[in-house]
Amino acid sequence: MTTPQHPEDFLHAIRTRSAAEDGIFWVDDTRLGVFEPEAARRVSATNWRRFVLPDRLIDMLRRRRSPEVRWSQIRSAWLTQLHTLATAEHHGSLIDRMERIIDERLGEDVDLVMLTQDVALRSMLPVALSGLTSGESELVRRDLEMKLLRLVSPEPAGTWHHLRFVVVQLRSGLVVRRVLRQRAHGKRGRELDLADPFVDLLPQLGMDRALDVVTTVLTAIGGPPGTAAASLLYEFVRHPDWQRRLTEELGAVDPVEFRTTPTHAAPVTHRFVKEVLRLWSPPLLLVRRNDFPFDFGKTRLEPGDWYLLSPHLIHRDERVWKRPDVFDPDRFLPGAPHGPADRTCYVPFGWAPKKCVGANIGTVQLMGLCHLLCTRYRLTVEHPEKLTMALRFAPVPEGFRGRLALR
């Protein structure tokens, strides 16, 4: 595994230790690796149970407690809004936005990693925060792009870059504050996005906590979706047999049915997306602080200890997956002998009840990208068999360039 600060292949070393020590071991003196599927599920679920937002800044300054708001309430508001957005019309709008962004770069020799980040971010931004002016949208996008570059860059950023990052982050935060305040005062229309439910909760949350909530969802669309999309293109160009299978299915599917329920309308494509996420789900490692005592037999995790989780390592675990390093979407066929041992073994979006709220719309976005690749565009990449994947905060295909043209 390569990271900006860790050039050694330490992820491989952790995987080797996990296989030898049954998935639970001290990675170093301060962090316990919890890579056994059931243990990871239990630790994640228990620590989420009473997870609350921090107190408002004004209340901390006055040394008093804020009204308690649990993250489960925030998740519930997001899920309700996402359910409203789960229609053929909204799915179609998401796919149409991706199409317009890709059309801007037709015929160019492009960095496909950066293109997919741009496509994923710009197409998903209206889902998170819509109704922005062009200037506001540019500020928010620049903030998210700079956060991403800090993660994927192979070299640490310098002082000047850090100062620019802070300034852009502050200006983006001011945009979010202005949008929420103007919606609350009736000076800006309400929107069907993931920020809007918190306009009504402003008296309880306070502006600083509302900003944190909206920033959380903006950050979530500013890296992982584009990383997953780049990984999808990586496997797409490396497997011409699956290109043919997807093209055959998506060329025959009813467009309205696909936009309504893509996972039902295109099961082969859905399996392809699931296998991409199994092999390359971002981020690779999650660091968490523990709040409850756990006894794992050979060791304990005490309150205040730090622990690591990794969907990537669970998805590559030979104890629960057969031939885990082989790309084979048909492992997700019902009854496939090389499929997941049980539901706890496939966690590309994390563990319930903290599973990523954007799992469904993220899947729609990736399947929509497959549909565009197979019905509208032709992607050309030289020597796809020579492509390699760098493992940084997330998987990043190296030297991944190509051209998109209309079919």
Spans of features found by a protein language model:
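N-terminal membrane-proximal hinge/A-helix region immediately C-terminal to the signal-anchor transmembrane segment
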Residues: M1-M60, C345
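Cytochrome P450 heme-thiolate "Cys pocket" and heme-binding signature region
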Residues: T261, V320, L333-E398
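Cytochrome P450 catalytic-core helices
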Residues: G222-E249, V357-Y377
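Cytochrome P450
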Residues: P37-E38, N47-W48, R56-M98, V113, ...
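Conserved cytochrome P450 K-helix E-x-x-R motif and the immediately C-terminal K′/meander segment
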Residues: T2-T16, P255-G297
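Conserved cytochrome P450 K-helix/beta-meander segment immediately N-terminal to the heme-binding cysteine loop
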Residues: W48, L309-P337, A359
